[in-house]
Amino acid sequence: MADIKNLNPVEIWRNFDKLTQVPRPSGHLEKIQAYLLDWAKEAGVEAFQDPAGNIVMRKPATPGMENRKGVIMQAHMDMVPQKAPDSKHNFETDPIETIIDGDWVRANHTTLGSDDGLGVATIMAVMESKDLQHGPIEGLITADEETGMYGANDLPAGELNGDILLNFDTEVWGEFVIGSAGGIDITATLDYKEVETDKEDAAVKVTLKGLKGGHSGIEINEGRANANKCMVRFVREAISELDARLASWQGGNMRNAIPFQAEVVLTLPKENIEALNDLVADWKDEICDEFEGIETTENIEFFTENVETPKMQVPAEIQDNLVDAIYACHDGVLRMAPSMPEIVETSSNLAIVEIVDGKAAIKILARSSHEYYKMYLATMIESCFNMAGMKVEFSGSYMGWNPNPKSDILEHVLKVYKEQNGTDGKVQAVHAGLECSIILSKYPNLDVVSFGPTLLSPHTANERCQISCVAPFWNLVKQLLTEIPAK
């Protein structure tokens, strides 16, 4: 494990190093919540946990600066628990093993947690600082952002007092985000009665892995391969041409990550196994050809393993309906923003497919900065799975964050950034969910901007943070807090 705590600036890296030692996957936040409260008590910082599981910290103004506008610094405490297929890491018990790789910090075949651990570490650095001049400050460290923004959604109104929100969940240094996409989770489920497998049939497990995956908002416009969408094309042909039957399917594991791996168990007549192996080889070639220049094709694996024949399998009619629905379900970009053609407006990610033991569950995350188009896409997907006889539920819907290019805090941030770095910052809206939109719905008078150091491949085992960006990011935060204007 690399010693990252002495990297510059030590104020942030020291705290981030501590965070890597505390397990904090989404949905399992008891340890990090307790750690943050204990840390605040030891640092002499006022802190409490609200009913939503968020940690709120408060620091009074430096004497003489009590009349300045109040600033809320915001980041989320949870991290995406993704790992390489051969990793034995347990996200609920094991610390993250960090590695310094040139100008980057990464983990050992797991997500790093810099999304959004570096934001949390920045809040901690400000709160414990003894020499930083500032007005009234609050730190809002939210729970379960990655699985549905539940902490932000359940944030009590009236809990915060600030006038300005600095969100630290943007992943390209020099970009200042003033708008984001809304989102909605779509879950299609079906209970079915399994049927017996033909005793003369063999069984084969087919695995596709080695795809890049990635963030289903930020990287959806790159055209990366979706393991579930690739797999369904193969499965449909195996069923129609080789008399194969579906016994089970497992693809993807995170609603907001492009699935990089999928596996199915098929049963089929023994005399067709060789033809199935040939079909897998053909589809591997096809996938590599289609995604040449997008995927790292030498990492793609598509292979078969002979397995014990399961006693039960999916009924033929149910199987065909499920396969057709997965095949037809929209995945990827639906529309670019008409006013900003370089930015994705509406997209969806066919994130998770689980078909096993008489139960099917398919999970999709749709995003759009346009509320009508978000619901149009969600209803399109609902209709697709309704035709397969599935029950479809919507959850976790949140609206987008409408940009305000005349924001006072944006103007101030851009001014300080140019003073410090000699170049102009880039104002952006992003095709991803940021908690800013939800917090704004509860605190509509906040002036909001989001920024942060550069991260690459968040939500994947290749996640990494650029070391050289963290110091200028910290310098910007410090000067901003010092120069916040009076109310």
What do these predicted regions represent?
Residues 3-103:
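Acidic/His- and Gly-rich active-site-bordering loop/insert found
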Residues 9-12, 338-341, 345-358, 421-479:
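Zn-dependent metallopeptidase/amidohydrolase metal-coordination segment
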Residues 23, 103-106, 146-147, 153-367:
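Midchain, well-structured core segments that form catalytic/ion-binding scaffolds
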Residues 40-46, 237-245, 292-296, 343, ...:
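Short secondary-structure junctions
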Residues 65-147, 152-163, 189, 203, ...:
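Active-site metal-coordination/substrate-binding segment of hydrolases
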Residues 158, 223-241, 268-273, 320-327, ...:
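His/Asp/Glu-rich mid-to-C-terminal helical/loop segments that flank catalytic regions of hydrolases
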Residues 219, 226-228, 233-249, 403-446:
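Active-site-adjacent substrate-binding region
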Residues 343-432:
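Substrate-recognition/cap regions that form aromatic- and gly/pro-loop-enriched pockets
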